[in-house]
Amino acid sequence: YDATITPRVISDHGFMLGGEFRYLFGSDQGSIEGSYLPNDNGGESDNPNDPDDAFDGEDRWYVDYSHYGRFTERLDYAMRYGAASDGRYFDDFGRDFGEQDTEYLERLARLSYQGTTWNLDARAQGYQRMDYPLDEDDRPYYQLPSLTANARWQQDNGFYQEWNSNATYFWRDLQGVDSDGFWEDEETGNTRRILLREAANGTRVNLTPAIGWRAQP
C-alpha cells in the first residue's frame, strides 16, 4: 500500500488538504482519494449572486472510494462511492489524482459471476452529476437494482441457443415534484407538470432469446 498527502493554499479560497491511499492484498485492491477545504473564502467575486461566490463560508470537499475483489475465480465484486459537497467543486479546484472524470461521481455495488454457460450480474448504481446549478432535467438515474442473466449453449452440429435478460428499476430524484406530477421552483414559485417520460421512475425488463446455426469452415 502507499499514501500521498497533498496540502494546497488556494488564493481567494483558503487552505485545502488532500490525500490518496491505495492498497493491494491477495485478489483485492482499492483506493480512496479526497480533499477538504474548511470555510471557503468565496473566491475573488464580491457579488453574492455570482457562482464563484456561491459557497462563501461553506466547507468544500470530495471523496472517491473504489474497491475490487474476488471471492472465487468465477465470482467477483466491486464497490465505488463518490460524493462531493457541491456540483461546482471540480470547476473551482480540479482533481489532484489519477482519476480524471470530473463530470460525474459514481456510486456502485456490483456482484458478477462468469460461468461456462451462465453470466450473472447484480448491481446498484448511481451518480452525482457535477454541475452547478443543476437543472432538474439533468438529474441522473439510479439503477436500484439492475439484474442481468445471460447464457449460451453450443451444440457440436453448429446450432446454438442464447438467452439475454435484464431487469432494472430506474429511480430519479426530482426534488419538488408532488404526487400530482407538478414541480415547483423554490426560488420563483413557478409550477409545471412533470411528464411521465421525464420522471421515468419504474421497472424495465428486457428478454432476448435467440437460436442460430453457425457453419464450420
Regions found by a protein language model. Name each.
Residues 1-217:
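Outer-membrane beta-barrel proteins and related beta-barrel translocases across Gram-negative bacteria
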